[in-house]
């Protein structure tokens, strides 16, 4: 069975989004990144294991697919942007009750019962499934017990307030799969729900 992997940028105090419009992530997904080379390599390594990318409707409408499609074209030989090419090539699934059909290449829309749709994806063939979306989408997946692995990219920032992913429901206990600090100040911690 394929794993559902939730990747989230997070502040040291556990927020995944700021209430104010301020830059706090080491990389805000633009052309300039404060990530060090080792972090970039490790980030790309995750994408080599993926078969499917699950996205929230909002993430797609805010330009996720267009942005990374453009990055793949703009930086075709840049090793750091190899993940962008993988996003273009991978199957994408958008969870939405509002979109009727996909207008993006290699992308389909699923609606209705989210746990049923995710279970069907997990039963499918291919590599693991990465999830990208906002706090609400991530919280819904967590509350439904659908996440098999958390990859938390903990930025060296304290927000004090904002959006969290574990407020609605969380796991009473997580098992640490690994944690790695990087020279740029990022710590990537990987957890699985305790059995």
Predicted stretch roles:
Residues 1-195:
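Enzymes that bind and transform nitrogen-containing heteroaromatic metabolites
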């Amino acid at each position: 069975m394929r794993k559902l992997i939730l990747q989230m940028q997070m502040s040291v105090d556990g927020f995944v989004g700021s209430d104010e419009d301020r830059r706090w992530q080491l990389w805000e997904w633009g052309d300039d990144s404060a990530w060090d080379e080792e972090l970039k390599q490790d980030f790309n390594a995750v994408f080599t294991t993926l078969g499917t990318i699950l996205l929230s409707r909002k993430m797609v409408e805010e330009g996720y697919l267009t942005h990374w499609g453009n990055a793949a074209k703009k930086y075709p030989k840049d090793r750091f942007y190899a993940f962008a090419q993988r996003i273009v090539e991978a199957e994408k699934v958008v969870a939405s009750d509002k979109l009727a059909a996909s207008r993006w290449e290699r992308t389909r829309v699923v609606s209705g019962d989210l746990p049923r749709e995710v279970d069907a994806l997990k039963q499918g063939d291919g590599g693991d499934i990465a999830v990208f979306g906002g706090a609400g989408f991530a919280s819904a997946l967590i509350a439904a017990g659908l996440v098999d692995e958390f990859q938390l990219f903990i930025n060296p920032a304290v927000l004090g307030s904002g959006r969290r992913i574990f407020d609605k429901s969380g796991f009473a206990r997580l098992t640490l799969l690994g944690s790695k600090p990087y020279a740029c100040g990022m710590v990537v911690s990987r957890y699985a729900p305790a059995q």
